[in-house]
Swiss-Prot record:
The lineage of its organism: Eukaryota, Metazoa, Chordata, Craniata, Vertebrata. Forms a beta-barrel structure that accommodates hydrophobic ligands in its interior. SUPFAM superfamilies: Lipocalins (SSF50814). Glycans are attached at N51, N78. Disulfide bonds join C89-C186. It comes from Pongo pygmaeus. It is found in: Rough endoplasmic reticulum; Nucleus membrane; Golgi apparatus; Cytoplasm, Perinuclear region. This is Prostaglandin-H2 D-isomerase. GO terms for biological process: mast cell degranulation; prostaglandin biosynthetic process. Catalyzes the conversion of PGH2 to PGD2, a prostaglandin involved in smooth muscle contraction/relaxation and a potent inhibitor of platelet aggregation. Involved in a variety of CNS functions, such as sedation, NREM sleep and PGE2-induced allodynia, and may have an anti-apoptotic role in oligodendrocytes. Binds small non-substrate lipophilic molecules, including biliverdin, bilirubin, retinal, retinoic acid and thyroid hormone, and may act as a scavenger for harmful hydrophobic molecules and as a secretory retinoid and thyroid hormone transporter. Its EC number is 5.3.99.2. Residues 1-22 form the signal peptide. Monomer. The gene is PTGDS.
Length: 190
C-alpha cells in the first residue's frame, strides 16, 4: 500500500488500480520548449484526478504533500515526495526516465512491474505545473491520472479552474477530481 501512496502523492502519482472510465480520444501534448532545469525544486500536490476507484474511495483521507524534483544522472528526474500516512511522515523517491521529447518521462512501478508515461503538459515553472500520467496495470486495466502541482500550498483559484477544465477535457468527471487540503504535517524541509 505504501507504493500506492508513492505513486499518488509523488506525481502524486501512478500505479493505482480500480474502476475504469473510457479513455478520451484526444492525445495529451507536452509543454512546448520544456526547460527541465526550471522545473526543478519544491512543488506541492494540489489536485488529482484519476480513473481509479482508489481515488474515489480514499480522497477524503488524502492531503497535500511536498515533492522535490532533482536531476537524475540519466537526464531524467528524481521525484522525492513526503506525505502523511498513518500519522507518520513517509518519503518515497521515483525515478522518471527520459522518454522521447523534453517533458516526457516514463516510470516503472516496482510493485506492479508496469511502465507509465508521465508528461509535463503545461507549466509556467514559477507557480504551477499540470502533469498527465497513463499506463496499464494489465490487459484491459488502463490507468490515467492528472496532477496539479503548485509552488505554494495555496494555488490561485484560476489555476484550480484551469486544472478542472484540463481534467474534464481528458474525460474525468467531477467525482474523480479532488483538490487536496493543506496540512502542516510533513511539509517542513528535511
Amino acid at each position: 500500500m505504501a507504493t500506492h501512496h508513492t505513486l499518488w502523492m509523488g506525481l502524486a502519482l501512478l500505479g493505482v488500480l480500480g474502476g475504469l472510465q473510457a479513455a478520451p480520444e484526444a492525445q495529451v501534448s507536452v509543454q512546448p520548449n520544456f526547460q527541465q532545469d526550471k522545473f526543478l525544486g519544491r512543488w506541492f500536490s494540489a489536485g488529482l484526478a484519476s480513473n481509479s476507484s482508489w481515488l474515489r474511495e480514499k480522497k477524503a483521507a488524502l492531503s497535500m504533500c511536498k515533492s522535490v524534483v532533482a536531476p537524475a544522472a540519466d537526464g531524467g528526474l528524481n521525484l522525492t515526495s513526503t506525505f502523511l500516512r498513518k500519522n507518520q511522515c513517509e518519503t518515497r523517491t521515483m525515478l522518471l526516465q527520459p522518454a522521447g521529447s523534453l517533458g516526457s518521462y516514463s516510470y516503472r512501478s516496482p510493485h506492479w512491474g508496469s511502465t507509465y508515461s508521465v508528461s509535463v503538459v503545461e507549466t509556467d515553472y514559477d507557480q504551477y505545473a499540470l502533469l498527465y500520467s497513463q499506463g496499464s496495470k494489465g490487459p484491459g486495466e488502463d490507468f490515467r491520472m492528472a496532477t496539479l502541482y503548485s509552488r505554494t500550498q495555496t494555488p490561485r483559484a484560476e489555476l484550480k479552474e484551469k486544472f478542472t477544465a484540463f481534467c474534464k477535457a481528458q474525460g474525468f468527471t467531477e467525482d474523480t477530481i479532488v483538490f487536496l487540503p493543506q496540512t502542516d504535517k510533513c511539509m517542513t524541509e528535511q
